[in-house]
Amino acid sequence: MHILLTNDDGLKAPGLQTLKRELASHDCRLTVVAPNGQRSAASHSMTINKALYCRDESTVPGIREIAVSGTPVDCVKMAMEYFLKDDKPDLIISGINDGYNLGSDVLYSGTVSAAMEGPYYGLPAFAVSMLGMTDERCVQTAHLV
């Protein structure tokens, strides 16, 4: 299974990196396209009238990791329309977000908005969030995914 991973906390965020390691251990093919820094509460915003910059920051053989200068939604769009145009994923997962996304929080969540792009491309997608991100809890959450 080919999975696109993204988030709103940035490419180097512990939640995303832990989820990447967990899914890689289950022999999933992964592509990671995430913001180059923190973009929490970006909601469903997109970058317009401004250039987006992308940088390959792959560290693990066989897993492509790309940092994008835009929002979480920009990351999914860049992945689907450029990087994975001829190699569509089977699933999009956004997270693990550092902080709950409950109630009206989902309206402002970049994590949730990135996952909401999935159906636009005909793909299943979901977001994962947690509060109290310790290494142990993050690993447990990644294992549940």
Where on the chain are the PLM-derived regions?
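Conserved active-site and cofactor/substrate-binding residues in soluble primary-metabolism enzymes
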Residues: 11-14, 18, 71-75, 87, ...
